[in-house]
Amino acid sequence: MSFASETKKELTNLEMKECCEKAELSALLRMNGSLSFSNRRLSIDIQTENAAIARRIYTLLKKGYDVTVELLVRKKMRLKKNNVYIVRLVEKSREILADLHIVRDDFSFIRNISQELIEKKCCKRSYLRGAFLAGGSVNNPETSSYHLEIFSLYKEHNDAICELMNGFDLNSKTLERRKGYITYLKEAEKITEFLNIIGAHNALLRFEDIRIVRDMRNSVNRLVNCETANLNKTIGAALRQIENIRYIDETVGLDILPDKLREIAQLRRDYQDVTLKELGEMVSGGKISKSGINHRLRKIDEIAEKLRAGETVAKK
């Protein structure tokens, strides 16, 4: 089971107050429901591939409105061939849609979220929970990028979801997709805050555990890469210095170098594996800093380059 499916399964087991049940059910019906007329009767089909969500909708309708609800199961014939669960409501369809603030009295569709549904903070959380159950997804935190989104067919409703989320300081953003719109989060901290808001506490803890391990692993990898790069740079510099010293020795001899440079050249040639700090401790006449050793080695590099260019280097 995917991380998103586990999160939704957890959410379907939450208990709520009556006002919150109404807010969650409104989001579920608005986003997953479709209307049809048969034998002069209006019916509502709420379709999902998640059995736990279908049971949740069925229970909320029975509990909230005491109506007869049908639960149908069909097999998809394409792609994964998953089961499709259809919760069908025939009784009081118009009244329930109006009570959930999905349609007006004249049966015109309400595209945004009614403020009457979300007056209380707990109801705001519940509406977001219903929206996530109906059209939400969240990446497994072990994957390369953090991403949570809620899909909606209508721009007005999508903008309302974004506004509702940002009322909790989530910094969510919207994006148009080919068949609708999404409100999404990309920051790991904001995703965990959203999971907390909708009541997915177990999913939150799992997300955080995985994220901490992943971030620690990334930090270690960055540190190792940095140290490896520095080591490669140091080795490269040492090899260049040794090659230049050998070139000077074979071309004109190290005696052409000033005394201080000649001593460093001989030490670098004879002790190729030691660090600059260790070289500085080996010179005669007292300890020299790393920067001092580096300065002398650069002077040796310059002399080698002049010799390669055919210039004459006089002994100083």
From Swiss-Prot:
Organism for this UniProt entry: Bacillus cereus (strain G9842)
The protein's name: Probable cell division protein WhiA
SUPFAM superfamilies: Homing endonucleases
PANTHER family xrefs: CELL DIVISION PROTEIN WHIA-RELATED
InterPro entries linked: Homing_endonucl, Sporu_reg_WhiA_N_dom, Sporulation_regulator_WhiA, Sporulation_regulator_WhiA_C, WhiA_LAGLIDADG_dom
Pfam families found in the cross-reference section: HTH_WhiA, LAGLIDADG_WhiA, WhiA_N
NCBIfam families cross-referenced by the UniProt entry: DNA_bind_WhiA (TIGR00647)
The keyword Cell cycle is annotated on this UniProt entry: yes
DNA-binding region: 275-309
Family the entry assigns: Belongs to the WhiA family.
Swiss-Prot/TrEMBL keywords: Cell cycle, Cell division, DNA-binding
Single GO molecular function: DNA binding
Domain of life according to the entry: Bacteria
tRNA processing keyword on record: no
Record HAMAP family: HTH_type_WhiA
Free-text function comment from the UniProt entry: Involved in cell division and chromosome segregation.
Record-level GO BP terms: cell division; regulation of sporulation
